[in-house]
């Protein structure tokens, strides 16, 4: 690279005069030839910084200056945008930081050489006498904040590699050419505000002799005669490489990292200048990295700088032997191996060394030298490159390709045809290349060797750095945290000590120690707060080094809360907390969301329609001031869809739009154009007209969900009137439900159109005192578009209208006719009673065949054919529908055209990542992956082709996994039949452990009790009481004690009457007697449960809730696994209810068909039956009350149901 500003002064030669004593730090006189003719085509440009849309921001370009510039208002600091206009083209560059170019901890070393006269020979060049000592003069971190990569906006297949350390410098690869850009003068960062001139030139325009890369020296291992003496020195390293694989950290199957030591000799440093050479080298390596990211390579390789060494003068000339490339490469490789860090995990341990020089180490035209397949070798992984500007990046990429195993294209392979198109591994690098790419042979040769280069599998960006303390405040005092929060000089406030220092961090400055400030946050956990104590969760407590980290886990979901709206579709939520357990001591938070929602109250509101968004705006009328004034706020729909769930309102007085600084309420419609999608916590949720979340179902023109317009009618007409006096004059009405309403004047008129809500009397348009002007507004829950053009008014809304409206005119002149035409669409059931000539049926949807797509090309390249594919299209909205809607006999014949006429490149097998294993253990687990045959195209993209075009065996797409024995588990057999036919018995089953005594968990039970109907062998000998014939007591036959006493009467009634205890339960909680005081005195006694299968509409009652039915004083209670007091039959009855829904209900005083009055004596006599029985079970839907000594039956009619057993 040269100082191009000197070229413009037409200086043919520049003399750099220095003293010439040949020692370190002293340089001989050098003449540097700077012919302006070297660049046949170049342009001077002034790049600008822009935003994403390409709008000008500033002339600031450099990273160092951008930090100080107040005009840099880029919305995303992770992206930069620049505009460059050159060669008649606009390049809108979109850049992001190349965070993978410089490894963490990378350094730049400046070496210094001292030669001491003597008889000791140089260890590298035997023929030079003297003793050399080399020391590191200084070390500094390698700059990492100004390397960027990206592309050109809206141009596919482009790439950009640029640094902005000092202006813009790097490579721009467009769709048909490669360009280099660099500043005209260096070191002018602080003068960029006025614009900085850069030079842009084409790579193809660099005038130089074709570089014959066929002469570059790439030797095999047998050629390393000069390095035999290193076998012993590096034997241990080689063995270590074979025995110890470097850690493979997050490296994907096609993700490799070449960690580079960049050696730079003194000739390069002097040419570019010590203050600029680092920026230049960073740019150069950024370009090399981008070349290896080209998709044509087929493997993703990162070129990562871990160390850069700048050599002194004496060491530089000792390594390079003029005219002897093999000896020069041998010296460079030996030197690089001596720089290697012995620790494989050292951040500066390199995989490959790249050496740059401007010295002539070979014949004219030779640019680089490298061994083939030397990557990862302790000595052979190195290249020697002649540096000659940014185009040298291709030389470096070429030579590194040899080390990776690539041969020259056309030499020993069949890719000679690609050299003319600019392949990176072409033996002759021609100046006319327009676009570089990697040939198919380079990709194949790389894949042949890449898997053997284990050193490329580790990730330099994921080293095992020293473990950080679990508590972040351990390393920072309160004074330091104050300095971080408020700036230099601030310390912990000591003006008052009455507070716990861990509650809030208060800070003050020594200049005003009694003025304390806080950011309302506590100090970091781990901050020392007293001797032997630290802050933890806002408290100062004794230090405990054994605090265990605990990850969080979700607790159970709450019940769904109340609905956000009473009608018109609302939302209700349920939540869960991360407290089972909570994350503590640095543990992971719970994954996933802490809330769920569902739609509720989706029915339409029955009363007068109210706009939910309008209500929220109207609530701000009394207290929200805008520009120190209160307003009447109307709803406003923001044009940005992302902001429509934020509450924006429009002033009725001024038309100003104000943000109310809050989200709209859940359930508010996102848009007035979509009556179903709603806002949920600030996000628009898609809802179909079927009121299902995520549904795509839509209404037809008259509001039928999923309809086809068959029920739609169009109403239209013209109404003409001539006003005789001033004041509003009614023209006509438009009914509710109207959609796609259009009202317009037929001719220019001085009168003004007005619209009034018939239901409320509120003027929607042009009320009293309003100025008539074109506008879009929202009213009646819909959006209206009012337009005045050439004194002709028109009004349109998509509707639907929720209330009827009246169309009026405001006369401005008497005796001037006004003629209005109206048109709207409405459902046939809502058509108003008017002249039938004004009502026409809406046209049904019509369909036509339309070009849908083209078939896949018959050939992936080399010229094939494809045919048209036709689909059925609806004419009304041009949407594609199922082909059955179109007539098959009218389908057009397919049209043929040629395709893929580009020259063929060889398709390759590409395998994606393996999916998760289907099993965690056992013998049947497997995992799958997608394997495709992809053809690289000339535009840098890939195309999927048929597998027959890919050579070689198809990679496996299924493989076994997790084929390990599963932990032993208990196996259980089926339960046997009950051991008895009635009463209590037992059931048994077989329980086995297939692994002896090594099964996990507690052994399942093998015996359990079973309960069958009670045994009853007593014959019925007739009724034993006169009460058995009373109809009022007939329903007590379900009670075993009563049935036994009245067996004859009960058996007769069972065939004609439904069982009285099976009457359906009450439909409201008020109809269920839950207090024993409500029962007849004769029925108050311990009560068991009756199986009950009917459900109330309100909810089901589970066994776990039964214990609370009777209230705290109830006589009956049920708790699982508990034994109530009483006879065995009560216990068996509860067991029979095991898995059924049961209900405590009361016994009614009379059957549903009669009202019977029982005397107290009769009730007492009836109670004698139950005193002898073990339990009672009853059902009722009645609620009784006692008034004036009489029992009043308030029961409602009931339905009978059956009992399932």
UniProtKB/Swiss-Prot annotation:
Residue ranges, annotated region (Disordered): 1174-1205
Annotated Zn(2+) binding sites: 398, 402, 408
Domain Disintegrin span(s) in chain numbering: 470-550
Cellular compartments per GO CC: extracellular exosome; extracellular matrix; extracellular region; extracellular space
EC numbers on record: 3.4.24.-
Catalytic site positions: 399
Known cofactor(s): Zn(2+)
Stored Pfam families: ADAMTS_CR_2, ADAMTS_CR_3, ADAMTS_spacer1, Pep_M12B_propep, Reprolysin, TSP1_ADAMTS, TSP_1
Signal peptide residue numbers: 1-20
Sequence ranges of Basic and acidic residues compositional bias: 1185-1205
Glycosylation sites: 83, 119, 242, 345, 475, 814, 942
Residue intervals of the Peptidase M12B domain: 256-460
UniProt note on tissues of expression: Found in cartilage and skin.
Cystine residue pairs: 333-382, 376-455, 415-441, 482-507, 493-516, 502-535, 529-540, 563-600, 567-605, 578-590, 978-1010, 982-1015, 993-999
Pro-peptide positions on chain: 21-249
Residue span(s) of domain TSP type-1: 551-606, 845-905, 906-965, 966-1014
Locations listed in the record: Secreted; Secreted, Extracellular space, Extracellular matrix
Family matches, as PANTHER family: A DISINTEGRIN AND METALLOPROTEINASE WITH THROMBOSPONDIN MOTIFS 3 (PTHR13723:SF158), ADAMTS A DISINTEGRIN AND METALLOPROTEASE WITH THROMBOSPONDIN MOTIFS PROTEASE (PTHR13723)
Pathological condition linked to this protein in its record: Hennekam lymphangiectasia-lymphedema syndrome 3: A form of Hennekam lymphangiectasia-lymphedema syndrome, a generalized lymph-vessels dysplasia characterized by intestinal lymphangiectasia with severe lymphedema of the limbs, genitalia and face. In addition, affected individuals have unusual facies and some manifest intellectual disability. HKLLS3 is characterized by widespread congenital edema, facial dysmorphism and protein-losing enteropathy of variable severity. HKLLS3 transmission pattern is consistent with autosomal recessive inheritance.
Role of this protein: Cleaves the propeptides of type II collagen prior to fibril assembly. Does not act on types I and III collagens.
Protein name: A disintegrin and metalloproteinase with thrombospondin motifs 3
Annotated organism of origin: Homo sapiens (Human)
Gene: ADAMTS3
